[in-house]
Amino acid sequence: MPRPKCCRTITGEPPCRAFTPAGTTGPAPSRVVLSEDEFEAVRLADFEGLYQEEAAERMGVSRQTFGRIVGAARAKIARVLVEGLALSIGGGGGTGIAPSRSYMCRLCRHTWDMPSETDSPAECPACRGRNLFRCGASLETAASGRECCPRERKAT
């Protein structure tokens, strides 16, 4: 059974969700789907010019995972350009537009949001506990007790 995907933060909405080659006649060309997290990876790496480590941190994934996402996205874009295919953007497991980050205290289960551009909190504002995690999903997911990206491993 494959490991579940970690939640990914997507901060930029694509201005268009579909592209088709100009000058095509006849039946519609085959379509390649670029997921929202692949779009975000290309936006951060190629449009904003961020290094993979910083871009991975913004998306809430490891650098290695970011490298795989951006590599897959670039391969799809190259295929679209070389073969003259249509491109659509959507789906892919991102958490949607997230101008803020959600945090949860593992001690008291208190949840709160902080702006994305601020540093991670040092302690819980409710109980002053330091056992925190950042959840890329909505606060509803965090409040339900389901951790989208638990960073600690349970001792066996």
UniProtKB/Swiss-Prot annotation:
InterPro entries: RNA_pol_sigma_r3/r4-like (IPR013324), UPF0251 (IPR002852), WH-like_DNA-bd_sf (IPR036388). HAMAP family: UPF0251 (MF_00674). Belongs to the UPF0251 family. PANTHER family: PTHR37478, UPF0251 PROTEIN TK0562 (PTHR37478:SF2). This is UPF0251 protein Sfum_2819.
